[in-house]
């Protein structure tokens, strides 16, 4: 398609400012949008929700941002978002009901946010060395099974690690009960002392592809990539439940180009653009037709249990923001790692 309307007449602007995670979009998506709508996209990237929040607080104006669930909840509470204009949203039919249910937990009916990617946290394991029956029996506690000492990767994040410990103990990942949190701290200390885990972030991908360890705590998108590169790897979401999350597109309250922002959000839901992005990124698309295609026989994620994961376990939880707790867990996490 080519431009029929002058974007300045139609949207009041021919420039759109987008702030997204690094490497979190298909290679041609921005160029396609610019060409189709006759506009220029200024695209910049962040690597944590907290950096995004600091930028917004500092008054930087973006038109579309892509925070995670708990940060959207916080931005809503602080009146930092504007409602979406659903008259632009023509691509809603293929939104996955699973991601919509997640979204509704923090933004009922999607007044402010449109899901982009979603996923879970789980265990990538070497199927040759780890018995799946043992995984099912022990769940998260397999991370403290000394048979695998020196052979596990933990994700270097207090939030994800305390989630693992709290779930292993049968508690909510969002607990504010200090007795439960202290118990989780002891659980992680014992894991540190007996298992000697390596604490990693993105380098876990190549390490697991190269069979460096047997078990790793990872995000489902990273797991999907690892499995696509190494068929000996599997993905398991423990039955005690885990963190399920979504990153969604929202429009800040101070956005200068809200009409174009709504048009862009709808464009991102297109089958072709969602497909391009999901192939590039490896995370599960909010577009269920994209997920069906990529999971089907002979396709990129055929038989890949991390890409089309089952989010139906009622013990799964969405992370809730809690400033006080964040500081407590952060301090504890530092203490665990330097033991």
Task: Describe the residue ranges of each PLM region.
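Short loop->beta-strand "edge-of-pocket" segments that line small-molecule binding or catalytic clefts
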Residues: 141-156, 169
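Short beta-strand->loop
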Residues: 82-93, 113, 231-243, 252-255
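Ligand-binding "clamshell"
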Residues: 76-83, 107-111, 225-237, 299-302
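Ligand-binding pocket segment of bilobal, Venus flytrap-like solute-binding proteins
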Residues: 153-157, 161, 165, 173-238
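Mature extracytoplasmic/periplasmic domains
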Residues: 252-313
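Early extracytoplasmic/lumenal segment of secretory-pathway proteins
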Residues: 2-74, 78
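Hinge/lid segment of periplasmic solute-binding proteins
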Residues: 2-12, 54, 73-118, 132-141
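Conserved C-terminal helix/tail region of periplasmic/extracytoplasmic solute-binding proteins
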Residues: 309-339
